[in-house]
């Protein structure tokens, strides 16, 4: 089976990709989105989102990285897709699933689910602009406020010439509510298409991964939030390994505080470590205790000292 690390805006940046791919067995990472509006973006934008471009589009441990674009105008999606791959990205992905109100308000992400023709035009333009040996992929949800158009959306992706499709098993309106996950609908899409379909949503451990694959028939999954709850989740999902012990999680957090974020104003680790602990608290009681001990700290140096001082 293949396990992909999902794009999570504001969460899974290059530093976290470096940490997670070092202790996992991911087949591919997708970057946070590059927002495309009405221009060909400067090279520095791609390097900021995906510094792995300087290293053959791979993380330090060797996992391939693919740039994701977010936008609605086929011409500019195409030009920026061409630039991304010319810079070395291992293919390019189109975001048609982000449920953020800000993103949707500007006509991007899940808003495209309302107009499958626009998905078709965007993906087709990207496919034409990218060398044929490189993948052009698309990530969608089941629909905007219902799944009534899921086949129309999936057909648009395949007819555009996309290499594969990632389907998050909820509509935009359903957000991330666990009770709404619909792996069966992903399976219906998989049966309809001839291109590979990758299942996404509520894959949080070995059992849920097995259930998802059995229900959907997919042999590849993409994991997002769960990868932060359990830092070695790809190995749990692939090999039924136990979750990472807390002392190893601490070691990972300690390494995180030592990594330098380019352009950091001093607040990067403050926000990101507190955010990560919020995910870890779902699996590790010790993370709750650590969060309480640092929640009042507002300087990176203070948080780094507190985490480095943990005895493991």
UniProtKB/Swiss-Prot annotation:
Chain positions of site Interacts with tRNA: 35, 95, 176, 272, 274, 279, 295
The family this protein is said to belong to: Belongs to the Dus family. DusC subfamily.
Keywords assigned: Flavoprotein, FMN, NADP, Oxidoreductase, RNA-binding, tRNA processing, tRNA-binding
Cofactor(s) this protein cannot do without: FMN
Gene: dusC
Organism: Salmonella typhimurium (strain LT2 / SGSC1412 / ATCC 700720)
Gene Ontology molecular function terms on file: flavin adenine dinucleotide binding; FMN binding; tRNA binding; tRNA-dihydrouridine16 synthase activity
Reactions that this protein is recorded to catalyse: 5,6-dihydrouridine(16) in tRNA + NADP(+) = uridine(16) in tRNA + NADPH + H(+); 5,6-dihydrouridine(16) in tRNA + NAD(+) = uridine(16) in tRNA + NADH + H(+)
Function of the protein: Catalyzes the synthesis of 5,6-dihydrouridine (D), a modified base found in the D-loop of most tRNAs, via the reduction of the C5-C6 double bond in target uridines. Specifically modifies U16 in tRNAs.
Name of the protein in its database record: tRNA-dihydrouridine(16) synthase
Annotated FMN binding sites: 7-9, 68, 139, 200-202, 224-225
EC number: 1.3.1.-
Superkingdom to which the source organism belongs: Bacteria
Active site per database record: 98
């Amino acid at each position: 089976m293949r396990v992909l690390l999902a794009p999570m805006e504001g969460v899974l940046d290059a530093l976290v990709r470096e940490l997670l791919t070092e202790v996992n067995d991911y087949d591919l990472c997708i970057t946070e989105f590059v927002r495309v509006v009405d221009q060909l973006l400067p090279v520095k934008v791609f390097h900021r989102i995906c510094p792995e471009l300087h290293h053959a589009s791979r993380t330090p441990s060797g996992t391939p990285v693919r740039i994701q674009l977010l936008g609605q105008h086929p011409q500019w999606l195409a030009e920026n897709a061409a630039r991304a791959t010319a810079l070395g990205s291992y293919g390019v992905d189109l975001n048609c699933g982000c449920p953020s109100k800000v993103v949707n308000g500007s006509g991007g992400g899940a808003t495209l689910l309302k107009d499958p023709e626009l998905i078709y035009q965007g993906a087709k333009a990207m496919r034409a602009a990218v060398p044929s040996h490189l993948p052009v992929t698309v990530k969608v949800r089941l629909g905007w406020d219902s799944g009534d158009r899921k086949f129309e959306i999936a057909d648009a992706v395949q007819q555009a010439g996309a290499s594969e499709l990632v389907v998050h098993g909820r509509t935009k309106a359903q957000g991330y509510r666990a009770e709404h996950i619909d792996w069966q609908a992903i399976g219906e899409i998989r049966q309809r298409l001839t291109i590979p379909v990758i299942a996404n949503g509520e894959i949080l451990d070995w059992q849920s991964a097995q259930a998802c694959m059995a229900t959907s028939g997919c042999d590849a999954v993409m994991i997002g939030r769960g990868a932060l709850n359990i830092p070695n989740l790809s190995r749990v999902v692939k090999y039924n390994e136990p979750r990472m012990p807390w002392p190893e999680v601490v070691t990972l957090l300690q390494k995180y505080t030592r990594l330098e974020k380019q352009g950091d104003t001093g607040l990067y680790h403050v926000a990101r470590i507190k955010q990560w602990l919020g995910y870890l608290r779902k699996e590790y009681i010790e993370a709750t205790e650590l969060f309480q001990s640092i929640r009042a700290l507002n300087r990176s140096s203070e948080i780094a000292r507190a985490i480095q001082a943990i005895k493991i």
